[in-house]
A protein has these predicted regions:
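N-terminal Rossmann NAD(P)H-binding glycine-rich loop of SDR-like oxidoreductase domains
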Residues: 2-26
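SDR active-site strand-loop-helix element
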Residues: 10, 35, 60-66, 101-107, ...
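Conserved Rossmann-fold NAD(P)-dependent oxidoreductase catalytic core, especially the SDR/UDP-sugar
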Residues: 3, 87-133, 158-160
Length: 341
């Protein structure tokens, strides 16, 4: 990419998209196309085709995706919208001779019983976790679209599979948030309760009374003395900061072509931090960072995930990229941002 290359970020309002936009601007790229959902419905094939024909982007970061806790609540919407929007963008990128595209897969698209840390060759080697099918299956389809378009049409579309993503602009709503931001907010609110900082609690929750706030937080196992976490806490996870993923994305866009990985079985790239820890270890790390002095209670009578998710990112590391932000540092950055926001 040159500094004046025409770059399109699909999904620029998401956690990754925002980090990419900042990273590209800081690197001097100035010809960046951004369209929100009101301006461009990515599920609508005609609109996407018209957009690509009119704008002629040279480089595409396909970050857009419908997220809903892996599609547990709206699986039909998740599988339909994600399948359509990625197919529309990949096809239009081919038709309009996009020089390079990066698509994003997910660790949840790997089989439920894949051996950890999971290598790229594990894709399609077994069944997905049933809870992850609505989100994971479109990711597999997008991955294979990129590979087969490359082989048939000589495009240069690369897929990156990411570990659990976190960052400053992630979702903190306790009903929707993923494990890391949910824990961060729970411990923060428990700390405020313990310190009797009523005004800060009400401002954070946008509520009018302490009784209302306490009743709401009790539903999520949060009080001034303890934070309850569902399950045993023994499940192992890996996390990558959005700034690191943005950095990896730009590195791949500038330095790695499909021909560099085409000979591999399953020619895509895992992107992870290589830091593996249990949910229990994560909880105590966040507890210490936030400064909550109460207890952590693991309720093993509640539903628990037994599926560890760790990625083998050695293929990308051997091609020259390594992460920069360790987990503790990343959580501290995230918490500082949350306090200011």
């Amino acid at each position: 990419m040159h500094k004046d290359s025409k770059i399109y970020i699909a999904g620029h309002n998401g956690t990754l998209g925002r980090a990419l936009l900042v990273a590209l601007k800081e690197s001097g790229f100035r010809n960046i196309i951004l369209k929100d959902r009101k301006e461009l419905d990515l599920v609508n094939q005609d609109m996407v085709q018209d957009f690509f024909a009119r704008e002629k982007p040279e480089y595409v970061f396909l970050c857009a995706a419908k997220l809903d806790t892996l599609g547990l609540f709206t699986p039909a919407d998740v599988i339909y919208q994600n399948s359509m929007l990625q197919a529309n963008i990949i096809q239009s990128s081919y038709q309009n001779r996009v020089k390079k595209l990066i698509f994003y897969g997910s660790a949840w698209a790997y089989p439920q019983k894949a051996m950890n840390p999971i290598g790229e060759e594990s894709l399609l080697s077994g069944k997905l976790d049933l809870k992850a099918v609505a989100y994971g299956l479109p990711k597999i389809i997008g991955t294979k679209m990129c590979e087969f378009y490359n082989r048939q049409y000589e495009t240069n579309f690369i897929t990156l599979y990411l570990a659990n993503l976190y960052g400053e602009t992630t979702e903190f709503d306790l009903q929707k948030a993923k494990v890391l931001p949910a824990l961060l907010r729970k411990f923060h609110l428990a700390k405020l309760l313990r310190e009797n900082k009523t005004n800060e609690i009400l401002r954070d929750l946008k509520m009018n009374s302490l009784d209302q706030a306490q009743e709401y937080l009790q539903n999520f196992g949060v009080n001034e003395n303890s934070v309850e976490i569902w399950g045993s806490g023994n499940t192992i996870r890996e996390f990558i900061h959005a700034k690191d993923l943005a950095d990896a994305s730009i590195y791949v866009m500038q330095n790695i072509d499909f021909k560099d990985i085409a000979s591999h079985n399953e020619p895509h790239l895992n992107v992870g931090s290589g830091e593996f820890l249990s949910i229990k270890e994560l909880a105590f790390l966040i507890k210490d960072i936030v400064g909550f002095n109460g207890k952590v209670v693991f309720n093993d009578e509640k539903p628990d995930s037994t599926m560890d998710r760790m990625l083998d990112s050695s293929r990308l590391q051997n091609l020259g990229w390594k992460h920069k932000i360790n987990l503790e540092q990343g959580i501290r950055i995230m918490y500082e941002w949350y306090l200011k926001a």
